[in-house]
Amino acid sequence: MASEITNGKNGQNGKNGQKEESDSQIAPPIPYPKSVAFIISNEFCERFNYYGMRTILVLYLTNKLGYNEETATVLFHTFTMLVYIFPLIGALIADGWLGKYKTILYLSLVYSLGAMVVSFGAVPLSGMPTKAVTVVGLLLIAIGTGGIKPCVSAFGGDQFSLPAQSFQLAKFFSLFYFAINAGSLISTTFTPILRADVHCFGDQDCFSLAFGVPAILMIFSVIIFMAGKRLYRCQPPAGNMIFGVSRCIADAFKGWQKRRHSEPMESFLDYAKPTVGSRMVQETKCLGRILRLFLPFPVFWALFDQQGSRWTFQATRMDGNVLGFQIKPDQMQVVNPLLILGFLPLFDYIIYPALARCGIRRPLQKLTLGLLLAALGFFLSAGLEMKMEQAAYRATPIEPDMTHLRIYNGMPCRYEISSAVVQTPRVIEPLNVWEDLSLQMTESKEYTFNAQPVSGECPSIIDKLRLQPGKSVSYFLAQDKLVEFADGLQMAATDTGRTSVRALLNTPDGEGPVLLSTESATSQEPPLTLDKGNVPQLHRITPGFARVDINGKKVASFEAKEGRLYSILVTGSARDGYQHNVIEVVALSTVSILWQLPQIVVMTAAEVMFSVTGLEFSYSQSPPSMKSVLQACWLLSVAIGNMLVVVIAEFKFTSSQSGEFTLFASLMLVDMMIFLWLARSYQYKDQREDFEDDDDATIDSVMQSKPKATTVDTTARKTNGIEAEPGYGAYRNHAYDNDFSEA
């Protein structure tokens, strides 16, 4: 029998012998469910696999599969969109057929298979359709991870007895999110190292290993999940509530058509009560009120998920050298989970209580702040991109009617050049370059070119310059001819943290081999053979110290910095000796990669305010029978957000990346105002309402028989002294009630 305690004023009123006491019973404390440990561990391993694979995916698409940045961005967000579409299917399977446990188990096996297929596809085997294998693997991963997403967090919530453990449930979601970001932190730290610092199959990187290690962790996650089977509280499937909701809406429409004049009702859905019952109608109304709030959410996810695509590509154009240590572009993604691990306790114990003192403690208020912070993060990224674009004009024309022209002098003589496109005759020093990056041109033209030696015994060169609007073209004076080649500077400068070198050799035929070798603090690459006749060829090297050897003799050496394109001009012969000059043609990576930190910090704070709060809000406010479905709808908003990125990337609404970032930030501000308008009248549902006795209707009756109608009290009431009011209701974060309770 439960012990009894006095509540209120205890003791006796001495002289009068009167005493006031009110007795109430309390149940013994419910122990924290041990099964949660297996769920948290499983989530850690699964997230390690997902984020490890996702971290390097865009670089794999560009570096190995040959896609450009735009196409890689579209593919990345299409994959992410599928990842968040399949939760709806997973929820249907869990709620209507297998239950959460079996759904998680079976789809995790599909997930593991997909991870292994992607890893196998990264092995450079002759004749293997790498792109097709990768697509199949990514599709299996999308089915697996998407299918289990709505089930795992809800399955964890099922382990708690509510409302008695509502406080522990709130802390579980923080712990659950902690596990997600711990797995993400470790995988985003080490997966780029496996990719870049390990050499395999004759390549300078090892994507197969970088994909393979996370795949092994995914297999471990399945084993861990199965190990806790005996401890799980497995709720039986509550019925396929998608069809239940659809039936409710369809019956309401039929009833409205027949009885709207003779029997007007307050709500459209009330017309379905005779067929599906009062409780089903009320839960459908509750679902509709929550989904109405979800409408603006996709824009947030459109911004958030670009950390893995656009922000990673932005990092490739930045200088990763920090105190002698080279930060890889994809490693910047590690900052987000690292900050999450610190931000969760910071927000729980400092920021949220501080906001509560200012009257900001409701979930919808926190969600609004999260939207605002996301907009701020993208305004910061737009500002950073503008700074980088100031140097980008050297790589490629920034206007469609602009042309870049460079003329390299590979001769040991000074040359005076003249042409109709050159306003006045110019002198080019030996082994140097003349350039004009602001030529205005509306159509393709040919111009006569004349190069006369000013000093030394060199021949005159007369040829043609062929220029096109919006293009960058270079010419090389060598021996007695003018060699034309396309620059390819933009691609070189954005090649994921590597450096590009072009060799312009004015040496006798037959002298060689000409070798380019590089050495960094962590590795030494095998020498590359330079082909004198292949002038346009760009050689990708790792930043470090580079040298050029001809016939085993060192000709040139220089420090190759990240994100640069160098032209090495060499003239002479083995008999007379060689002369050289190293020209840094493009230096896009002059902005430190650490300048990405402010936008990452702001976006991480937005994630904590929005995602953690939204996860708890969705679970606590959803009807008991629809929790997995509502979780799937939450994740479906992520899919729509990624589809928005695909649309904007494909239609190219702006001509610059900074303009695109500004567009997303502006959309976020408009989206936030829409959310404020939608949330202004939302009334929170107390979790304890889910556990009040309801003898008149059950969810089972929706599928099986016609229930009795019930009357639902929608007037304001008090719950534990907390009065419901518009936009607040009886819901509050109970963790702060002791300190900030209202009168």
Swiss-Prot record:
Q: In which tissues is it expressed?
A: Expressed in thorax and abdomen of females: apical epithelial membranes of midgut, rectum, and reproductive tract. Also expressed in neuropil of the central nervous system, with elevated expression within the alpha- and beta-lobes of the mushroom bodies.
Any single biological process term in GO = oligopeptide transport
Q: Does the keyword Membrane apply?
A: yes
Q: Which UniProt keywords apply?
A: Membrane, Peptide transport, Protein transport, Transmembrane, Transmembrane helix, Transport
What GO terms fall under cellular component here? Answer: apical plasma membrane; phagocytic vesicle membrane; plasma membrane
Gene3D superfamilies reported for this sequence: MFS general substrate transporter like domains
Subcellular localization, per the record? Answer: Membrane
Q: How does activity depend on pH?
A: Optimum pH is 6.
Region named Disordered? 1-28
**Subcellular location, principal:** membrane
**Can you say what this protein is called?**
Peptide transporter family 1
Query: Which species is this record about?
Result: Drosophila melanogaster (Fruit fly)
List the lineage, top down: Eukaryota, Metazoa, Ecdysozoa, Arthropoda, Hexapoda
